[in-house]
Amino acid sequence: MAEFHDDDSQFEEKSKSQIKRELHALQDLGERLTTLQPQLLERLPLTDPLRKALLEAPKHKAHIARKRHIQYIGKLMRDQDVDAIVALIDQVDSSTRQYNERFHALERWRDQLIAGGDAALDAFVGEFPECDRQHLRGLVRHAQHEAAHNKPPAAARKVFKYIRELDETKRGLR
């Protein structure tokens, strides 16, 4: 009688639970793709049916209809190069995160300038030497006056806009 050798290293079948986890991960990725803007979807290596399904997703408002559509997107995701899609999404998330960090840093500069006086202005000019100190001082004084009189922060917005323009010039974006 022939002996039967069970060699597990040759065949590694996925359990039903593992398959379900992978399919749910594809659905989650598909749901994440539905939140992207259409111009970003154009950059992704997607098949036409999937691209169409992703663009139709916002039309489904009812909970069950949306859930069913996400499941359909998950089914279409099985035929995709998921690694390339994830890499591009990570790149977009990273650039968005960097933009938000820079935006918050500029907001902190604005708040320090309005609250801090000459010491904050000197520190800012040290960071941005191409700054028109007199113009910035006028904007800051106007913003301080508005804050003291509980007026809308129009001058604070102008301070932020000027700071952002200086930052973009410094980083070569202008």
From Swiss-Prot:
Entry's InterPro entries? DarP, DarP_sf
Instruction: Spell out the CDD domains in the cross-references.
Output: YjgA-like
Cite the entry's keywords alphabetically.
Cytoplasm, Ribosome biogenesis, RNA-binding, rRNA-binding
Any one GO CC term of this protein is: cytosol
Q: List, in alphabetical order, the Gene Ontology terms for molecular function in this entry.
A: ribosome binding; rRNA binding
BP terms from Gene Ontology: assembly of large subunit precursor of preribosome
Q: Where in the cell is it found?
A: Cytoplasm
Quote any Pfam family the record assigns. Answer: DarP
Role summary: Member of a network of 50S ribosomal subunit biogenesis factors which assembles along the 30S-50S interface, preventing incorrect 23S rRNA structures from forming. Promotes peptidyl transferase center (PTC) maturation.
The family classification in the record reads: Belongs to the DarP family.
Q: Which PANTHER family match?
A: UPF0307 PROTEIN YJGA (PTHR38101:SF1)
Could you tell me what this protein is called?
Answer: Dual-action ribosomal maturation protein DarP
